[in-house]
Design a protein with these regions (language model features):
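Divalent metal-binding pocket/active-site signature
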Residues: 2-95, 107-108, 115-116, 120, ...
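Short hydrophobic/aromatic-enriched beta-strand-loop microsegments
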Residues: 75-78, 98-103, 187
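Mid-to-C-terminal alpha-helical segments outside catalytic/metal-binding sites
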Residues: 147-193
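Conserved beta/loop motifs at nucleotide-recognition and modification sites
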Residues: 130
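Short, surface-exposed amphipathic charged segments that create phosphate/polyanion-binding patches used
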Residues: 1-2, 193
């Protein structure tokens, strides 16, 4: 953890991670993953930087660790590339965390995920590409790229009943608030048609 904290002092480091639990691939033990996850949470708490959280097929254990660690002291975190269930998203929101969605939310069979996105407060949501993976419709199966994030934004804006421009403005504000080490003079909400 000391090395993570030391490296985080570099001016270009704006977050800790990605760290978390991945039970889809069984490359390391659950115990080892939990230990590493907790160390990253401690580093995020110590530095004040947001933690990018990876949670795949591990909602229950992720929620438990987040709740236990948050009880020890708050920290900023983003549930990156969110595809989990409603319970983990609700618990993250209750701890003032951000839930970030990718192109998966645009897929035909992702109605439950769109429902989760609709339930996340507007001031606690982000969109991302996770490029080169998870391209949104109509580019599913192709290499993802930053320009495609607008399709994810459009899908979530639609389920929230707001314009894409309103959604872009909100997510830009959320990004600036959470990633406060990023020079903000260059950030303007933009929707490219």
């Amino acid at each position: 953890m000391d090395e993570i904290v030391t490296l985080s002092n570099h001016p270009k480091v704006v977050a800790i991670g990605e760290a978390g639990l991945d039970y889809y691939y069984q490359h390391s033990s659950k115990e080892g993953q939990a230990e590493g996850f907790r160390r990253h949470i401690q580093a995020a708490r110590q530095t004040g930087l947001p933690l990018e959280i990876h949670a795949r097929d591990a909602d229950e254990d992720t929620a438990q660790i987040l709740e236990e660690e948050y009880a020890r002291g708050p920290f900023k975190a983003i549930l990156h590339c969110y595809t989990g269930g409603p319970e983990l998203a609700q618990k993250a929101v209750a701890m003032n965390m951000i839930v970030s969605f990718t192109g998966v939310v645009t897929f035909k069979k992702s109605e439950a995920l769109r429902d989760i996105a609709a339930s996340v407060p507007l001031d606690q949501i982000l969109v991302e590409t996770d490029a080169p993976y998870l391209a949104p419709m109509p580019f599913r199966g192709k290499t993802n790229e930053p320009a495609y994030v607008r399709y994810t934004a459009e899908a979530i804006a639609a389920v929230k009943g707001i314009t894409t421009e309103e959604f872009a403005a909100a997510t830009t504000q959320n990004f600036m608030r959470y990633f406060d080490k990023v020079p903000q003079s260059d950030l303007e909400p933009t929707v490219v048609a």
